[in-house]
Amino acid sequence: MANRLKEKYTNEVIPALSEKFNYTTVMAVPKVEKIVLNMGVGDAVSNAKNLEKAAAELELISGQKPLITKAKKSIAGFRLREGVAIGAKVTLRGERMYEFLDKLVTVSLPRVRDFHGVPTKSFDGRGNYTLGVKEQLIFPEINFDDVDKVRGLDIVIVTTANTDEESRELLKGLGMPFAK
């Protein structure tokens, strides 16, 4: 069974983008390459249990086992040693990526308090979009009673677009609610 969002991309977004930006071939049309979810757990330095809980929540959200990230160098001000586990990340591609993006746009983002759309300034100049989520409770898989601490996470949507404008049109076509 093909994903709903992937079908929308194939049937609606590709023709619309081809018309707007005058692409000669279908392969020139930008597409979502991968989505990276990153959860930095600063208090994991003092208590390793916090990192385990964060990783478990990230696994629930993404449906994939996260990679534990380690500190690249020691920073005395943060009481941080090189090689200490300080976060978790997941890279989603293919079917899981489209499922996550669909869930993010239709279910999770509307659950954010005082939500007026995602900011349009979060493009990096190369067609990638970064979104910060303040609390993991907006995802339907997270049970409110099981959460010990509200944690945020970063969501990076990597596209094959060359410019921010192309990327914005791609994400808008896929249903991303940008602020007016």
UniProtKB/Swiss-Prot annotation:
A Pfam family recorded for this sequence:
Ribosomal_L5
Which GO biological process categories is it annotated with? translation
Coiled coil regions in record: none
Gene Ontology MF terms: rRNA binding; structural constituent of ribosome; tRNA binding
* GO CC terms of this entry: ribonucleoprotein complex; ribosome
Please give the subunit comment from the record: Part of the 50S ribosomal subunit; part of the 5S rRNA/L5/L18/L25 subcomplex. Contacts the 5S rRNA and the P site tRNA. Forms a bridge to the 30S subunit in the 70S ribosome.
Q: What does this protein do?
A: This is one of the proteins that bind and probably mediate the attachment of the 5S RNA into the large ribosomal subunit, where it forms part of the central protuberance. In the 70S ribosome it contacts protein S13 of the 30S subunit (bridge B1b), connecting the 2 subunits; this bridge is implicated in subunit movement. Contacts the P site tRNA; the 5S rRNA and some of its associated proteins might help stabilize positioning of ribosome-bound tRNAs.
Per the record, the similarity remark reads: Belongs to the universal ribosomal protein uL5 family.
| Protein's name in the database | Large ribosomal subunit protein uL5
Source species: Streptococcus uberis (strain ATCC BAA-854 / 0140J)
- Identify the gene encoding this protein: rplE
